[in-house]
A protein has these predicted regions:
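Conserved hydrophobic/aromatic beta-strand scaffold that supports enzyme active sites
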Residues: 2-4, 11, 29-33, 45-47, ...
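Internal mixed beta-strand/loop scaffold within catalytic domains of large alpha/beta enzymes
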Residues: 3-17, 21
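Short polar/acidic secondary-structure junctions
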Residues: 6, 36-39, 62-64
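Alpha-helical interface subdomain recognition
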Residues: 7-12, 73, 96-251
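A short core secondary-structure module
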Residues: 15-56
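Flexible, small-/acidic-enriched active-site or ligand-binding loops
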Residues: 51-78
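A short, charged helix-loop
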Residues: 70-96
Length: 251
């Protein structure tokens, strides 16, 4: 994080940029994380209003899921004290809310996988091949059984993370496990549903193709699956691991 907040009177001057602001072309107010100083303790956040001096947004760029994002640019943009959301050291408090966001991410990914499953199930019950419906073929029956197990197991992990909240926030460990499994299951089930339906599932006339694209995005958004694995490993070994390269020794 390189966007800086430099003191200027009662407020701050913001310089830097922020990428991947989803639907930012429609927003009037933006939340941006900034660096007041070094390290995690130096991170906070401010509110920036569209149209103010020193602030602009880039042209929209489309994600594979169909959503669009813009980049934010700060060139000595002034933020008054009333627009400082979190001062220096505040990021440690706000980061607890990420687990809540990840629960929502997880639920949406799972819902898309289940929706794709239901579309493919109904298709297999009515589509005929070689004189009988697709669900009469044992190979496809096994596919649906495996998809059902993945969805139900993912749902239980999601409920565990949501219900076992401590002080209003899900635990980082259970949230990471749920996100890792549900994101993976949601995509795999949607992808398998498309395979079962063949060309019909690959068509934009069928919502399964959207489910595949969107569930793939959830495997990145809100913390990549690799980040979730890192967090789970820390719980396994009951210690923190730094993924950063060692700093060179100073003389």
């Amino acid at each position: 994080l390189k966007t800086t907040a430099t003191p200027d009177g009662d407020g701050f001057r913001i310089n830097g940029s922020k990428i991947f602001t989803t639907h930012g072309q429609f927003a009037d107010v933006f939340l941006a994380y900034v660096r007041y100083g070094p390290g995690v303790g130096g991170i906070g956040s401010v509110l920036i209003e569209r149209g103010q001096d020193g602030f602009k947004t880039g042209n929209p760029v489309k994600f594979m899921s169909g959503e669009e994002w813009v980049q934010l640019y700060f060139d000595d943009a002034y933020v008054g004290p009333e627009n400082v959301l979190l001062g220096e050291g505040g990021f440690k408090k706000q980061i607890a809310g990420f687990n809540v966001e990840r629960i929502g991410n997880t639920a949406r990914s799972l819902a898309l996988g289940r929706y794709a499953f239901e579309i493919a199930r109904d298709y297999a019950a009515t589509r005929e091949q070689f004189g009988r419906t697709l669900n009469e073929f044992q190979g496809l029956q096994w596919k649906f059984a495996e998809m059902k197990v993945k969805l139900d197991a993912a749902e239980l992990l999601l409920y565990r993370a949501a219900c076992n909240s401590d002080g209003g926030f899900p635990s980082a460990e259970e949230t990471s496990i749920a996100k890792l499994y549900c994101n993976t299951a949601g995509f795999e089930v949607a992808n398998e549903a498309m395979q079962i339906m063949g060309g019909a599932g690959f068509s934009e006339d069928c919502l399964i193709e959207y489910c595949v694209r969107r569930t793939r995005g959830w495997m990145i958004a809100g913390g990549s699956l690799e980040m979730m694995k890192n967090r789970i490993a820390e719980s396994v070994f009951e210690r923190r691991f730094s993924q950063r390269p060692p700093r060179p020794e100073t003389k």
